[in-house]
Amino acid sequence: MKIAILTSGILPVPSVQGGAVENFLDYFLEYNNIHKLHTITVYSVYHPDVNHHPALTSQVNSYYFVDTTSWFAKIKKHIFGLFHKDLQHHFSIEYFLREAMRHIRKCDYDVIVLNNRPGYADALAGKTNAKLIYNLYNDKLNVTTRAHQKIYDAASLIISTSEYITNRVKTIGDSANKCVTVYSGIELDRFTRKPTSDNLSSSKLGSDNDDFLMVFSGRVTQEKGIMELIEAMLLLKDEPHIKLMVIGSSFYGNANNENNFAKTLKMKAEPLKDRIVFTGFVPYQEMPSYLEKADVAVIPSVWDDPFPTTVLEAQAMGLPVISTLRGGIPEEVTKDTAILLATDENFVENLAKTILDLYNHPDKRKQMSAAALKHSQQFSKERYARNFFKALENIKETVH
């Protein structure tokens, strides 16, 4: 099939600036490049780092870049925003969509994949004969979404990253075979413990060999539950060997600018400054070196996290997981790999108790670690890509 993929209009693909959703796109584009299943054109914002990316040499995948950052593009975006007030997305995203649409209308695509942007369907209405597929990684289409029925009806297929997201879509309707779940995957070869002599020593992270080091990785934002984790650490103030490594910043790739929440968080952690280290943003390729230093991963999301890759990465590194009964998280783990907590009024206290329990029971951690390694094999990027393209077969026979 001849396929167009409309990206989010925020981060570039290939994923030279990171972003989980952009990484997922890279995975199935890489798979398509190897197996040559379809002819795919990706519509993405431009970034200078894509210029010499090897993905651009593919014979089956091509890229159409929209400039949104040059001074001329910024002027055009500003003018666009002045004349378009009632927009479904931010005017910068809508500008990207308009520029991409100018090219799309010249092409005869069989299928257009709207990547995490189901609202794009409004702009495409009546302007293409292609079938629309929504590829959802977040809760962006449910009964509370603006124009939800119109958007739902416009799709030939809706692929979601978890049953949680699929069930949210089904609050609108449950048409036969329209909704399918395809679990995301990760680079298992990257996230594996390897006997290397890297420069990341435990002492650099403020811990010794006899310490119990926990890791939190992800965006340092309120909904990720990091404040509750710090509060749990404060309840464990009399346990000097329990330490925490916080990996991440408030936004992807942002190593310098701290928002008010991050500043408040560090102030709260001040009494435990010798036991909590904030690494800031860590490049994706360096993440395994940090994770392998930890004994346990704590991912205490207090919102309905659709399918956080941090859970998959932790299990692939053989880390026992402490997380929550929110969103798609229960779909990523088993009772043998993780301890899941309710985010109720007792959450912080129960989080502290769970941390202390794993600290005091190394044999339990060892069993959970072995189970995590085994379970993680279900979430390879290859299986993800294969299942994604298998889902597309549902509509292939109906394409002209």
Which residues are covered by each model-predicted region?
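Carbohydrate-associated surface elements
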Residues: Y164, G185
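Acidic donor-binding loop of glycosyltransferase active sites
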Residues: E292-P306, L319
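A short helix/loop element that forms part of the nucleotide-sugar donor recognition site in Leloir-type
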Residues: T192-S207, N387
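Nucleotide-activated donor-binding/catalytic signature segment of Leloir-type glycosyltransferases, i.e.
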Residues: G126, E258-V282
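A short, well-ordered alpha-helix in the C-terminal region of glycosyltransferases
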Residues: N350, D357, K364-Q378, K390
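Conserved donor-binding/catalytic core segment of Leloir-type glycosyltransferases
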Residues: I159, D208-K224, I230-M233, M245-I247
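Glycosyltransferase donor-sugar binding loop
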Residues: K243-K263
